[in-house]
Amino acid sequence: MQELDLIIVGAGPVGLYAAFYAGMRGLSVAIIESAQVAGGQPQNLYPEKLIYDIAGLPAVTGADLTKNLLEQLAQISHRLFLGESVQKIEKEDGIFSVITDKSNRKAKAVLLTTGAGLLKPRKLGIDNEENLANEGKISYFITSLKEFEGKNVAVFGGGDSALDWSLMLEKVAKEVHLVHRRTAFRGHEMTVDRVMNSGIQVHTPYTFSNFNENDLELKKVKAEENLNFSIDKILVNYGFLTNQVSLAENLEVSRNGRVKADSMMQSNIEGLYVAGDASDYAGKMPLMSVGFGEAVHAINAMTKKLEFDHPLRGGHSSSIF
């Protein structure tokens, strides 16, 4: 394969948009993704969940967002390699070698859009949890809301995922119980208000105590008080454990394993950029909408370095298409 201007590692939303923007700025680009399907977390973990904070889209599911991004990407020349895991990235004489389990591709610049890395759901921590998960009694994310139609569902968690899924499940489930170990939720204020004004039964501050057949028992925090009700399914939204793997030697990362970036989203290795949840800097906000902007910064910066007659600021898309 010929030497490219840019290789993007990771085909989540930020990676897909970055590839489109790179093509719009005239760069030759390839994307490498370890999963068999592009789209990252929205496509693979919550394809039916509604996302509300993408500019210009009042609400969009993870699956539809991925579909839209792929349609946008189809407007420019690119190559997308799925099912390839990047093992390491090396740089020699100003050229990067991106070595995967299947190939060795070369580029003048690399953009990491690997998200939070390898994700492993946090579990309830009970003895028979694996068996209950195999039986479909316990889930950690939802790929199809149909599995919960007409069911009594308990959602454990206090963040945005637990709140959002509770609202989504209310539309299809018979009953939804939201269980949080604290009295206050950590999600967006508007979402918390929607939950509190819905038909969702909120139980705070309670924790899991026991689950036998369909009988769920909760224990009140710092009190000798239990609560029992019938449940068909449990959804655990305690977040994910992340495993960030450093792909390049001497790449500077922060304490949380994310790659340190400057104001132009470049790492300490010249020509190696980062955007989205894989990046870290002062004031970092781990939001998809922010990641799109970070990708634009990175692409414009590398375009300026690769093509010295190009301005740092890209033109308007309306003048290109």
UniProtKB/Swiss-Prot annotation:
Key word Flavoprotein present: yes
Molecular function GO labels: ferredoxin-NADP+ reductase activity; flavin adenine dinucleotide binding; NADP binding
Signal sequence range: none
Coiled-coil portions: none
CC cofactor: FAD
Keyword list, A-Z: FAD, Flavoprotein, NADP, Oxidoreductase
EC numbers for this chain: 1.18.1.2
Catalyses which reaction(s): 2 reduced [2Fe-2S]-[ferredoxin] + NADP(+) + H(+) = 2 oxidized [2Fe-2S]-[ferredoxin] + NADPH
Binding site for FAD: E33, Q41, Y46, V86, L119, D277, S318
Cofactor note as given: Binds 1 FAD per subunit.
Subunit annotation: Homodimer.
Family (UniProt): Belongs to the ferredoxin--NADP reductase type 2 family.
HAMAP family, A to Z: FENR2
Descriptive protein name: Ferredoxin--NADP reductase
Organism: Lactococcus lactis subsp. cremoris (strain SK11)
Phylogenetic placement of the source organism: Bacteria, Bacillati, Bacillota, Bacilli, Lactobacillales
